[in-house]
């Protein structure tokens, strides 16, 4: 209904001002209609090919029906009208499931005006079919609207329910127009002002039209610097918080107003919030946008669409059928609708049911229901309860207090694939691979319908077109049919893909390329379940951006609360019907002046109310219009902005309260379609002109300043503070005395993200640490001198990013010149700094480009330059001449035509190949690229080239990195290399196969031989006949010989395979030589040849090296010499070839000389080849494998040495080899302990070592169950204990006190030194007396031998034991006849004290001794005869029976000759001969004391109840250790693994076991784990710590450290000795007794 036209005419005619105003409004409305028509014409492109009359130009539509185009359909801004009229509209399917069905048949009356859905449809039809109005018709329309506005529609107007067909038609028409168009959106955005209205409209638009489930608006804290200040959350909406507009209204108390946000209720009941004080981005629930995305939006300055894949942890719970029927319209709902209307026949009812089900399914697919808390939440639920205050609190806390819990990946979306247009789902994302997408039972038949069958109505919207046209086949949280969504409610995806859209709100501009120069004032972000997001929806949003920007900018000028004096919000219900309506009013701060009904409250005024005056009109904000340049065709503004400008002009003419108006004026402003009438009632005398009124919110002090500034007055302090805080420079003041900051402006605080107190406390700590020292020094100097300050620094931003600033400061002085304060500024010059660096870099590149180009052209190689973006950017003339390509065809990727097709992948830069060729140079950190590529030459052949390039500017953007490289022709070298590689591979295969075969053969043959030799040794201990004993010895000798050959083969295979590893241990060179010669002495003396050796005086006595391997070399070489020598002698000499004291190394040289038959030069070439021997017809066939010398040479080379030989046939052979060793810095000058070798101070072994024992050695990997094999293993791999011994020896050398826990009762050492009494005595005194034995200075010794090298060897040994300075001389004779004649015919005048004779037979000895004893000069001479055992027996009998000989002066030395054998003979003649008896007494006394200690220990152990727990899995070891424990009287218990040991220990009392002996390698639980369990149990139960000793055959240092870390108290290496066990047990017993005495 509209009021009569004459009513408005009378009112207007009474005032001339209003007539002018009406004319101006008519003029503006005429312009507006044209602008709207031009604007809506541009909307047709955004909806694709679908034609809808509502999207046509209003101008073209209105030409058909001019009289019907008016603004009488615009409703007032009441919440109820917005629910029914304003965009977005509620789906009628949702209205049908309301709790009160009778609401469908009535409409509520509003205080201002009302609206009926039927009239809305009529007005819509009239709009679509009415011509455009003229200027006069617009005026009439204005009058008619005013008349209509004055009419009160307070009665309920029910729908026409004459027939069910009409009702169904009405519902169908209402459903068709539930979605508006872009035109409606734009008009609604600019129609209402205020942030609450803005946010309500945004929620309505994006939640229902753009399928948004979550929306947020962020804005910068400082608009003057949006890049360097953090952004904050202003508005937020979560689709999970729903509000039912038909339920009871929300009752909010006053406490809600004191919160930090305001709740806004949208048309569909959804709630959004607006922060009064904008919050941090972390407050956002699902974090739609963060600081990194903000920076990306600022850089791109355009709308961005991302795809986010979220990982959800959702329990797969079965939804009950009742839940399903409660979430969608059930049969009862449909029956209630049928009973209410009573006119629907069965066919219509089924059709309605189908539409409702499809609507529910589509709503679920489109993401209208929230999926954050549960899978499906429906608006059709019938048992919904109204919200309470606690619900609001929970929703607020859950939405804004929790941290984002979902893990997601985010990337920018691509364009839609062609499958998105298909009527069926895309096969690329089918969940069921067996389903054929082209032959399905349920297709969307509507997609194939003709135009005659289905026609689109005139009210279809942009979003509806998008869903039908572009969203087919999209991922709506799973690509399934509608039946699947309705029937399967229990399938919850673990990964959900959503679309995130970021819309920057920027000042609109007609030129799209100028967006880089604009900055957004806010960023609107929303989330949608449409993946990918439709393009036409994006186009619609882009057209709405200017209106969203204008609305948001205008809303910033309006206070968030409706009234400036408002303290809190009240949600009241003011309605004249039964329908509840939410209205927001503001309560005044003054309780004495409450708002009356009809007064203007906030930005909403009830113009029809009585008593309205100018005082009730709020201050109108200034608006930011969209410039006319945005519209390219029509350069005009739109209606909405013109309306607000008119209101602003009108308000500027209203005086405060002075003038009176006699006549009420009523006017109406209408803008757009379907808008409410807004009427303002004024009094005539209150309309005056007041141009001094400003739109900005200024204080009275500001007005005073504006008025007084012209008179020269200074601006007030508040204005100065505002100015300082607004300038884009950091301002600070500092104390001139201390230099500390006293104040900073707001710009500084925003940049650093701190408050004033924090900034004052931190001072200059935000400066980069590298710049801070220089800054403080210059700052102190400036403070001291009172001069200006200038420094360039890097200042830390709120997000920990450093930016360059120029800091300037000047002193502020008073009239006397004293410095009161320092005033400083910091100017951001980061961009200038980066630009300066880039300019310098480009200048340097440009300066060197010509030089590089000249050098490249002069190079004979191919030179090129490339980058990742453009490919090849330069190639020199050499490439052009080689390939025949032109420069233009080679640039970019054109060079690939000359690259072999298989090598083209190699041309990718390193970053493209994920680091395949990306080699980082460690020296300078540059990236290099190298590849071998085949290029085609001009003759068509491909040649190999080595391509090398280097990255000269390694930047973060890899596409701009410059690579310079060269190509070198390596074709000939490549061909040769391939041939050599093929030959080498084949040779290695053959050698590897042979070595593998030999290794397998040796292992398979040697294993049974070990059993044969072991059993034969046991057999020899039994009673056998002479013939059986002979057979057994032959078997033993043959088995040992065969085992020697097999071991040699294995050693050779290990050396060739690189598996031979040397050990470093202390050993004596002299002792090693003695051992090797003594081992082979029996073989040499049985053949009647002499065997001797010498070690020079300057050879270090102790060196570090692999003793066993060097002994093996000596045995092989000396044994080979003995084998090929039948007459004469074999002599070995050791000397120093080179010594280096700086590195503490020495190179020793060995020479082995024999008097055999020798060999020629041809045989010398075959000497060091495997399985080769010297063959000659004159030589007999000798046994052997032919591997001894080969293995010896390999071992010598492992010691950094060499081996060679020289020979002359018929004369003899000389073998030479060298090896490098480390010298022992600290000589052993202390006496060795009992039971240890006096040479190397290592414990003795159990039995005397022989050559055969060594060759029984294994490779160190097998662990047999017998002591014999275990001993062989240790001998084969002596490195197991060498490192430990070396460490212990080093420690004892430093402390000069040695305690050897490994001392044993055996009589043999690894170093080869014998344990006979004379040897021990020699080495003991030799260590204490390294200078030698002192004799009479007139003494003279004579050596007579029948061979050349034997006399030299005996003389050398005498020199090693006698002090040369106290001895006159040693005379040597190598010829017995010459010596006999000279000694008898020409006797020596000096005193001859010793004559050493080494003669070939017994007769020579008898002749020499008897003849010399008859001479008076040799009366007191001592004769030393070097003989064999048989010769000694015969000579002893002859001299004892002879009366002419003095047998007491005759002494015997058995071969092999050693210094230790001569030592007792010379020592008894020295001045210290009395010490021998004392030494023997000390030895006997020590033995007696040791025996007494053993008895005492046995008695104490039996008395104390000492008990031992043994954990060992080897039966032989258990027997040995048990025997030891029984001998010393210790109680013990045996367990077979670690688990049994732990359980046995826990079973007894804490102190029951005094010691635990635990093996490291055991089944079930090893020693390490068992020890850890025991130590852990002791700590948990506060048990005393029990001693645990580890037992292992591996004594390497890392094993000892591992035992210590695991909790072991000590470590024992196998084999375990009785003495060692006694020492450990006695130490524990003594400690226990002392503890008891102490307590």
Swiss-Prot record:
<dbReference type="InterPro" id="IPR001610">
    <property type="entry name" value="PAC"/>
</dbReference>
<feature type="region of interest" description="Disordered">
    <location>
        <begin position="38"/>
        <end position="76"/>
    </location>
</feature>
<feature type="compositionally biased region" description="Polar residues">
    <location>
        <begin position="38"/>
        <end position="49"/>
    </location>
</feature>
<dbReference type="GO" id="GO:0005524">
    <property type="term" value="F:ATP binding"/>
</dbReference>
<comment type="function">
    <text>Involved in the control of the SAPK-dependent transcriptional response to peroxide stress. Also has a role in G2/M regulation.</text>
</comment>
<feature type="domain" description="Histidine kinase">
    <location>
        <begin position="1000"/>
        <end position="1223"/>
    </location>
</feature>
<dbReference type="Pfam" id="PF00512">
    <property type="entry name" value="HisKA"/>
</dbReference>
<feature type="modified residue" description="4-aspartylphosphate">
    <location>
        <position position="1559"/>
    </location>
</feature>
<dbReference type="InterPro" id="IPR036890">
    <property type="entry name" value="HATPase_C_sf"/>
</dbReference>
<dbReference type="GO" id="GO:0032153">
    <property type="term" value="C:cell division site"/>
</dbReference>
<dbReference type="GO" id="GO:0005737">
    <property type="term" value="C:cytoplasm"/>
</dbReference>
<dbReference type="Pfam" id="PF08447">
    <property type="entry name" value="PAS_3"/>
</dbReference>
<dbReference type="Pfam" id="PF02518">
    <property type="entry name" value="HATPase_c"/>
</dbReference>
<dbReference type="Pfam" id="PF13188">
    <property type="entry name" value="PAS_8"/>
</dbReference>
<feature type="modified residue" description="Phosphohistidine; by autocatalysis">
    <location>
        <position position="1003"/>
    </location>
</feature>
<dbReference type="InterPro" id="IPR035965">
    <property type="entry name" value="PAS-like_dom_sf"/>
</dbReference>
<dbReference type="InterPro" id="IPR003661">
    <property type="entry name" value="HisK_dim/P_dom"/>
</dbReference>
<dbReference type="InterPro" id="IPR013655">
    <property type="entry name" value="PAS_fold_3"/>
</dbReference>
<dbReference type="Pfam" id="PF00072">
    <property type="entry name" value="Response_reg"/>
</dbReference>
<keyword id="KW-0902">Two-component regulatory system</keyword>
<keyword id="KW-0418">Kinase</keyword>
<dbReference type="InterPro" id="IPR005467">
    <property type="entry name" value="His_kinase_dom"/>
</dbReference>
<dbReference type="InterPro" id="IPR001789">
    <property type="entry name" value="Sig_transdc_resp-reg_receiver"/>
</dbReference>
<feature type="domain" description="PAC 2">
    <location>
        <begin position="929"/>
        <end position="982"/>
    </location>
</feature>
<dbReference type="GO" id="GO:0051286">
    <property type="term" value="C:cell tip"/>
</dbReference>
<feature type="domain" description="Response regulatory">
    <location>
        <begin position="1507"/>
        <end position="1629"/>
    </location>
</feature>
<keyword id="KW-0597">Phosphoprotein</keyword>
<keyword id="KW-0963">Cytoplasm</keyword>
<dbReference type="InterPro" id="IPR011006">
    <property type="entry name" value="CheY-like_superfamily"/>
</dbReference>
<dbReference type="GO" id="GO:0000155">
    <property type="term" value="F:phosphorelay sensor kinase activity"/>
</dbReference>
<dbReference type="GO" id="GO:0005829">
    <property type="term" value="C:cytosol"/>
</dbReference>
<protein>
    <recommendedName>
        <fullName>Peroxide stress-activated histidine kinase mak1</fullName>
        <ecNumber>2.7.13.3</ecNumber>
    </recommendedName>
</protein>
<feature type="compositionally biased region" description="Low complexity">
    <location>
        <begin position="67"/>
        <end position="76"/>
    </location>
</feature>
<feature type="domain" description="PAS 1">
    <location>
        <begin position="716"/>
        <end position="786"/>
    </location>
</feature>
<feature type="domain" description="PAC 1">
    <location>
        <begin position="789"/>
        <end position="841"/>
    </location>
</feature>
<keyword id="KW-0547">Nucleotide-binding</keyword>
<dbReference type="GO" id="GO:0000160">
    <property type="term" value="P:phosphorelay signal transduction system"/>
</dbReference>
<dbReference type="InterPro" id="IPR004358">
    <property type="entry name" value="Sig_transdc_His_kin-like_C"/>
</dbReference>
<dbReference type="InterPro" id="IPR036097">
    <property type="entry name" value="HisK_dim/P_sf"/>
</dbReference>
<feature type="domain" description="PAS 2">
    <location>
        <begin position="848"/>
        <end position="920"/>
    </location>
</feature>
<dbReference type="InterPro" id="IPR000014">
    <property type="entry name" value="PAS"/>
</dbReference>
<keyword id="KW-0677">Repeat</keyword>
